[in-house]
Amino acid sequence: MEVSKIRIHDLPEEERPRERLIKNGPESLSNAELLGIVLRTGSREENVISLCSRILMEYNIKQLSLANVSKLMQVNGIGKAKAAQIAAVFELARRLETFVEEPKRKISSPKDVYTLMYPKMREQKKEKFITLYLDTKNQILKEEVVSIGSLNASIVHPREVFKSALMESSASVIMVHNHPSGDPSPSREDIMVTEKLVEGGKLLGIDILDHIIIGDGRYVSLKDEGFVK
């Protein structure tokens, strides 16, 4: 059988481009193999790597990145779907070149947390427990919803809070939840959950900076209340 007609799935697994990328990284693949992973399938006459090799003989990478869908469809074996896939990949690459990451938001006080979170939580009909994961400069790395529903120790487990903290290499955590009643006064359950998480953070070397309870136009800081030490 001609090499160009051998299907990729007929190759030994260790020779397939996708499996090699996973094992050895994308830099280990040729341009044709990388493009083949994007297109996934070839044509009746040739496998995807043979097709991509032929495409790259007609266009170099720069030319390919500038070709529109109509131009790409002039290549034998390239229909609308494959042309769109190629155009989409290069458009993403162009957008990456001009991408500017927004500066991370810094938290300096409980009021900063309230200002950030109140618009997101004021219309909530159920209690929502959110964690803010911070770096060493108190800049937000990630915001994550941990639970929805009445706050209690069985729902908000330290494992759920600190799993993301460890994955994000967070230096500290701020916890936030709302009281749909509008009264931000902490319940006994709020205090128990806070104390449990503070102790868990100490074991892992991750500081719990505060637990903010948001009500109707006001908030309570459990650190200011003396429950976060």
Curated annotation (Swiss-Prot):
The answer to whether the entry has keyword Hydrolase is: yes
Q: Where, by residue number, is the motif JAMM motif? A: 177-190
Gene Ontology biological process terms, A to Z: proteolysis
Q: List the disulfide bonds.
A: none
User: What is the top-level taxon of the source organism?
Assistant: Archaea
Q: Which PROSITE patterns match?
A: MPN (PS50249), UPF0758 (PS01302)
The molecular function terms of the Gene Ontology recorded here are: metal ion binding; metallopeptidase activity
Read off the InterPro entries from this record.
Answer: MPN, RadC_JAB, RuvA_2-like, UPF0758, UPF0758_CS, UPF0758_N
Which Gene3D superfamilies does the record cross-reference, listed alphabetically?
Cytidine Deaminase, domain 2
Q: Does the keyword Secreted apply?
A: no
The record's keywords, sorted A to Z, are:
Hydrolase, Metal-binding, Metalloprotease, Protease, Zinc
- Please list the residue ranges annotated as the MPN domain: 106-228
Indicate which residues the UniProt annotation says bind Zn(2+): H177, H179, D190
Family statement: Belongs to the UPF0758 family.
What protein am I looking at? UPF0758 protein MM_2791
Q: Which organism is it from?
A: Methanosarcina mazei (strain ATCC BAA-159 / DSM 3647 / Goe1 / Go1 / JCM 11833 / OCM 88)
Provide the taxonomic classification.
Archaea, Methanobacteriati, Methanobacteriota, Stenosarchaea group, Methanomicrobia
